[in-house]
Amino acid sequence: MIKRIALMGSGSLGTTLGAFLSKAGHNITLVDANKEHVDALNKTGARIIGAIDETIPVKACYADAMEGSFDLFLYMAKQTANDVAMPQMVKHSHEKSIVVTCQNGLPEPEIAKYVPKERIMGCPIAWGGIFQGPGCTYLTAPPDQMFCTLGTYTGEHTTELDEVAAILQDGNKVTLSGNLMGLRWCKLTLNACFSSLSTITGFTFGEIIDRPEMMRIICYLGRECIRVCEASGISMEPYHFAEREYHFTKLYDFPGDDAPIAEAIAAAEEYLRPAGGKTLASMLQDIQHGRASEVDAIPGAVVDAALQAGVKVPVMIQIWDMIHRIEKGEMTYKPENAFLLALR
């Protein structure tokens, strides 16, 4: 039975989810390395603005101040922090502790270096947030538009899966699946397309949707993701959102240069704008704050998988390289960057 929960990595999403679970009565501790943020959370609570305006009392601590063991870890640290955060988590786990990774990219293989596969679950999240400062985050989606999917790394449907789902249900709506890697590739497709383009242009997801020329680029990036996923032997799951399913494989699997721009815009208007229209890529937020971004865990994950599968991804490689250059200060993010991409 799950009694103690630790949420590792209390950024924009972690603060919101942790606050909602705290409000629902769960014994959860928000863990973070940002001292000012932890102090603000403990002193004044989690301030959530944007889609709602509420301050929720929470319990928070620094990673090196964790005490005892926890039954459930909601792992929301950036992949760039794994080398530090994972050993800290393992130190406070026991033989039955469950780890639910809500990270971007394809994080489970890395988590499995520290935790047995049968204790790992994955939870791609379908809502966004923007960190505002110590103790405060901007929620881009109203609570009734907050969704996530959940599955075990082994693909089994266990009693623990149901228990974790019941807990997460108090923070956002949960859809269960026996195809976690298919879920991961669905979310990775979304992030590698929209987050990457947001990072090089500075546009929010909604501003990308507003521009047909940007959505044409999204179509090309999405097609490359689909081809890599298929070549890797993975069946991509539909995107579960607003109690409906959206099939990226059908949308972005187009021949030649005939990108389905109108269809892509219509689908994004329906499934993405309600919850993510105001979202700004987390990679861009990291760059703006002088932090290392997850460029190698998002577009880089597609590039790595493409190399292993023998699939060409020329557009993804270009945007991945561009983000690296922006991160190094060799370029600045601006809308004009999108037109430097050669679509083929």
Question: Residue spans of the language-model regions?
Answer:
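Nucleotide donor/acceptor-binding cores
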Residues: 2-4, 71, 146
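Residue-level detector of anion-binding/catalytic polar loops
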Residues: 27-28, 47, 173, 235, ...
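Conserved active-site and cofactor/substrate-binding residues in soluble primary-metabolism enzymes
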Residues: 36, 80, 106, 159, ...
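Internal alpha-helical scaffold of NAD(P)-dependent oxidoreductase catalytic cores
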Residues: 92, 114-117, 136-247
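NAD(P)-dependent Rossmann-like dehydrogenase/reductase catalytic/cofactor-binding core
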Residues: 219-344
